[in-house]
Amino acid sequence: MFFKKILLIGFCFVLLKAFSQKTYHKIYYKNGNLKEEGWIKKNKKNGYWKFYYENGVLKSKGHFKDNLETKYWYFFRKNSIKEKEGHYFSGKQNKWWLYYDDKGHIYHKCQLKDNKKNGYCLIYKMEKLTKVAKFQQGKKIKEWTDLKSFKKDNNLSDLKE
């Protein structure tokens, strides 16, 4: 009887240990190209992941915690040029996000909170700041096209145009 209990406890420990381990997963498209790869723990995406377009080009990369995006993420177009990058917290976009045009130049920087614009959004044209808007919980509350008035209103005398 004692031996059976020890054996059962040992078996349960082995099962628990096996299911709590991180395993590396790869999923493929029908054409054989890699679709996604990353770490699974307790049947959830946990850790660093990469996603690919069907042509094999990197689509996005970043971290998960319990199936939710977290930390810093990068997104790319099918031609490998960066599309956007920014922070996730519990699956929602937060902090500064940078958006790139099709040549890889920043055309938009925006502060987000829980997937909504919250703070400043800066619009660039040919790498030059042209417009600024201020948002609160996704709603635009003010916009500046005259950067001198924006700098004055916000005490930003050192901001480069």
Residue map of PLM features:
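Bacterial Sec-dependent N-terminal signal peptides
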Residues: 1-24
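Glycine/tyrosine- and acidic-biased, solvent-exposed loop/turn segments at the edges of beta-strands
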Residues: 16-161
